[in-house]
């Protein structure tokens, strides 16, 4: 009776194992014919098809990617190469994104981002905020790059590197996301226009309600067959918008009413963000491990490195083409290359079951890592050379004869006041003449 129970438990369907997976003969004493692969449900056309419930059907020539973990990547399934098809984890072992540690880390990061956005809201100048609203050239340029250039670039990169359907969808989702909070912090570090940066972040998140599903519908037909409505990330985008608008609005109010308190909040928010970044990198490395990172194809790493660079370059190029001021150029550049990876991760978790998304759940984190590193290099270059170049240009402008500077105006005022005045020698001579008379 105990043996029958063990066999029943072994053959019971598990939500963590792919349906078409053939277990190795040494997995149990049951014969291999009992564990033969089940027929795969075919979709109308090759690729993924999303149903109203979170189930995905693959065409016969496609195989879902099992979820790898650090403990399950040591070997492969029988008859499969371990580097291309890692062995699934134990059914009782949860995936790393469902562990209590990851949930606690998400809460910690969310609270730190709210504090950061509160501090960035305290940097907004209400007097200059309206000027960007009346003339939204920078915001329009950022939106053009965000929802025009980057989705097309992600689509072309997925085709050029011949990514599989799951990896291509992850890359495309990241390319269609709106701007993230990283751009606001980096704009502050490079002396950018904070009013423009916050306007671009808010406007891109609002536009994502319409343009993000549209871009996904246009570019994802090669891999996904699904109605447009099922890809609308309204809940995730609305939550992102609220977590951005509410702290920023409160920070603007504090700056308007309590100027000294706003300065203190800015310092505290920057310190908390630095601590958050350190903790985030340490905990992410602890949860993932080198084995999981090694399971990601090299082409995905190349895409994660190249996409932020292309976004930064396109934003700066468009801002230069429209003759924006230097601080606005840096702001548009950083806003275009920085994506909201938290939103991309949330959509991947909601739209795809864990057994199909597999290691491609890591792509938004890879993109966040490389976009932060590249933006950090940009900040270091600006701090080392940008300030000196700007000071030299200001000195050259003061020495230019065609420039009417404060120094020249001051010299002219001194010359005008000395014209027609009476010197000391002349005054003594006049007094002597009057005495003699």
UniProtKB/Swiss-Prot annotation:
Stretches that traverse the bilayer: 104-124, 141-161, 198-218, 234-254, 268-288, 292-312, 361-381
Cytoplasmic membrane side: 125-140, 219-233, 289-291, 382-437
UniProt tissue specificity: Mainly expressed in the central nervous system cholinergic neurons. Expressed (at protein level) in motor regions of the spinal cord and rhombencephalon, in mesopontine cholinergic neurons, the medial habenula, cholinergic areas of the forebrain, and the gut myenteric plexus.
Biased composition (Low complexity): 21-50
Subcellular location: Cell membrane
Site (Cleavage): 87-88
GO cellular component, one term: plasma membrane
Record membrane topology: Multi-pass membrane protein
InterPro entries registered for this protein in UniProt: BilAc:Na_symport/Acr3, Bilac:Na_transpt, Na+/solute_symporter_sf
Pfam families referenced in this protein's UniProt entry, alphabetically: SBF
Keywords for the protein's UniProt record, in alphabetical order: Cell membrane, Glycoprotein, Ion transport, Membrane, Sodium, Sodium transport, Symport, Transmembrane, Transmembrane helix, Transport
Post-translational note: Activated following N-terminal proteolytic cleavage by thrombin and/or proteases.
Region annotation Disordered: where it falls in the sequence: 16-84
Any GO molecular function: bile acid:sodium symporter activity
Chief subcellular location: membrane
Glycosylation: residue positions: 6, 20, 26, 181, 195
Stretches in topological domain Extracellular: 1-103, 162-197, 255-267, 313-360
GO biological process, any: regulation of neurotransmitter loading into synaptic vesicle
Summary of the function given for this chain in its UniProt record: Transporter for bile acids.
Family under the similarity heading: Belongs to the bile acid:sodium symporter (BASS) (TC 2.A.28) family.
Name of this chain's protein: Sodium/bile acid cotransporter 4
């Amino acid at each position: 009776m105990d043996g029958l129970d063990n066999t029943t438990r072994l053959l019971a369907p598990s939500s963590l194992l792919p349906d078409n997976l053939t277990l190795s003969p040494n997995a149990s004493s049951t014969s291999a014919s009992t564990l033969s692969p089940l027929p795969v449900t075919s979709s109308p056309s090759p690729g993924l098809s999303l149903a109203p419930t979170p189930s995905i059907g693959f065409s016969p020539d496609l195989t879902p990617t099992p979820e790898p973990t650090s403990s399950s990547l040591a070997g492969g399934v029988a008859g499969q190469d371990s580097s291309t098809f890692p062995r699934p984890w134990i059914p009782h072992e949860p995936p790393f994104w469902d562990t209590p540690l990851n949930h606690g880390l998400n809460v910690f990061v969310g609270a730190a981002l709210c504090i950061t956005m509160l501090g960035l809201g305290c940097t907004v100048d209400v007097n200059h905020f309206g000027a960007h609203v009346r003339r939204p050239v920078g915001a329009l340029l950022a939106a053009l790059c965000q929802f025009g250039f980057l989705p097309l670039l992600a689509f072309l990169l997925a085709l050029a590197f011949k990514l599989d359907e799951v990896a291509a969808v992850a890359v495309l989702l990241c390319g269609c996301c709106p701007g993230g909070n990283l751009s606001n912090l980096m704009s502050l570090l490079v002396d950018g226009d904070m009013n423009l940066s916050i306007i671009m972040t808010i406007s891109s998140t609002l536009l994502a309600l319409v343009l993000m599903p549209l871009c996904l519908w246009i570019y994802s037909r090669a891999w996904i067959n699904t109605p447009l409505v099922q890809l609308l990330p309204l809940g995730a985008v609305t939550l992102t918008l609220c977590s951005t608008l509410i702290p920023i609005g409160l920070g603007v109010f504090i700056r308007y009413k309590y100027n000294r308190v706003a300065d203190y909040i800015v310092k505290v928010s920057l310190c908390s963000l630095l601590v958050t970044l350190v903790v985030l990198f340490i905990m992410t490395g602890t949860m993932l491990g080198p084995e999981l990172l090694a399971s990601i194809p090299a082409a995905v790493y190349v895409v994660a490195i190249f996409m932020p660079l292309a976004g930064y370059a396109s934003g700066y190029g468009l801002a230069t083409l429209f003759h924006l001021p230097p601080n606005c150029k840096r702001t548009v550049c950083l806003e275009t290359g920085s994506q909201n990876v938290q939103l991309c991760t949330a959509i991947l978790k909601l739209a795809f079951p864990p057994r199909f998304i597999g290691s491609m759940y890591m792509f938004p984190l890879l993109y966040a890592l490389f976009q932060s590193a590249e933006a950090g290099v940009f900040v270091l270059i600006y701090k080392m050379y940008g300030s000196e170049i700007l000071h030299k240009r200001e000195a050259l402008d003061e020495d230019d004869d065609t420039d009417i500077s404060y120094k020249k105006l001051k010299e002219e005022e001194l010359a005008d006041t000395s014209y027609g005045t009476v010197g000391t020698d002349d005054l003594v001579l006049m007094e002597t003449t009057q005495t003699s008379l």
